[in-house]
Amino acid sequence: MAKHLFTSESVSEGHPDKIADQISDAVLDAILEQDPKARVACETYVKTGMVLVGGEITTSAWVDIEEITRRTVRDIGYVNSEMGFDANSCAVLSAIGKQSPDINQGVDRRDPLEQGAGDQGLMFGYATNETDVLMPAPVTYAHRLVHRQSEVRKSGSLPWLRPDAKSQVTFLYDDGKIAGIDAVVLSTQHSEDVSQKDLHEAVMEEIIKPVLPAEWLSASTKYFINPTGRFVIGGPMGDCGLTGRKIIVDTYGGAARHGGGAFSGKDPSKVDRSAAYAARYVAKNIVAAGLADRCEIQVSYAIGVAEPTSIMIETFGTEKVSNEQLTLLVREFFDLRPYGLIQMLDLLHPIYQETAAYGHFGREHFPWEKTDKAAQLREAAGL
């Protein structure tokens, strides 16, 4: 394979779409804390001065949607009108109904093992051994850049930083291996009182250099720091935000295929979310076991049916055993029925708000990032 470039992006917790994702998942967590069997599909829209929370929720719990919304926006850092959005004064509107009984009858079963999928759909999981967290490097470092922006903003060391930010990293690959970083883009919202010179220098020294490994940077690496020259108006004042609009940022940065379903605001009965987590778990364990250097898995479901309608493995020529054998191993060691994967990954807990910014994958404390099946897979494969 010749040299090639590959790029991924990320956005900070203060990006409008990510504000929406975090509010949706904060509502989900608050409900799951009281009612683990709740059915939640919570969508959020944010724009200057307002938040609209809607969706279908069936639960025995009562939660204060307005308080959850304000607390989430406050924790992100939008706490005064100078930023264009203020947790204390924005309007919070609610338009929530109940889940359709037609859907519910296909999901709930007397035998929980026969719990049907909450919808049809296809999901992908992916892993690669090019980073220590078995994730593609471009999206991993794009996340780390905006996470670092948040850290230095919240610590007060760069007091002119504001919550909205975006990053993009272009890696150079040679014969499929990382050869360096070709380009870095970092745009951050800021207050009026910082010069572009000071901003460029501080972003370079306090955000970019501490995050990106020096051995991948060279004299030819290109840096684009706030390339428009000004980013004062940001957050919901600059753009409206919606739940589920950053599905590539949430997953693999474009390095793997995507089934199209978003994650945030959905309880684990929605296979858009839970089966995508399970697919990541499967792919990561296959790579951790040394059965392939790269692994992508597709699973699909029919609404109301427990068993997946298909399982497909792709290893891009890096497999140590055949893809047919890998598929048999997946069926043997992983229960990909909705109830089975919920139990396998212990998903009925309020763990979701934290997933809603900086990526759902590659963060080791989430249960779908465990590699506890790797040794069994390796032994069963005869390696």
Curated annotation (Swiss-Prot):
Its cofactor is Mg(2+); K(+). Keywords: ATP-binding, Cytoplasm, Magnesium, Metal-binding, Nucleotide-binding, One-carbon metabolism, Potassium, Transferase. It comes from Pectobacterium atrosepticum (strain SCRI 1043 / ATCC BAA-672) (Erwinia carotovora subsp. atroseptica). K(+) binds at residue 43. Pathway: Amino-acid biosynthesis; S-adenosyl-L-methionine biosynthesis; S-adenosyl-L-methionine from L-methionine: step 1/1. GO terms for biological process: one-carbon metabolic process; S-adenosylmethionine biosynthetic process. GO terms for molecular function: ATP binding; magnesium ion binding; methionine adenosyltransferase activity. Signal peptide: none annotated. Mg(2+) binds at residue 17. InterPro entries: ADOMET_SYNTHASE_CS (IPR022631), S-AdoMet_synt_C (IPR022630), S-AdoMet_synt_central (IPR022629), S-AdoMet_synt_N (IPR022628), S-AdoMet_synthetase (IPR002133), S-AdoMet_synthetase_sfam (IPR022636). It comes from the Bacteria. The gene is metK. It is an enzyme of class 2 (transferase). PANTHER family: S-ADENOSYLMETHIONINE SYNTHETASE. This is S-adenosylmethionine synthase. ATP binds at residues 15, 164-166, 230-231, 239, 245-246, 262, 266. Belongs to the AdoMet synthase family. Catalyzes the formation of S-adenosylmethionine (AdoMet) from methionine and ATP. The overall synthetic reaction is composed of two sequential steps, AdoMet formation and the subsequent tripolyphosphate hydrolysis which occurs prior to release of AdoMet from the enzyme. L-methionine binds at residues 56, 99, 239, 270.
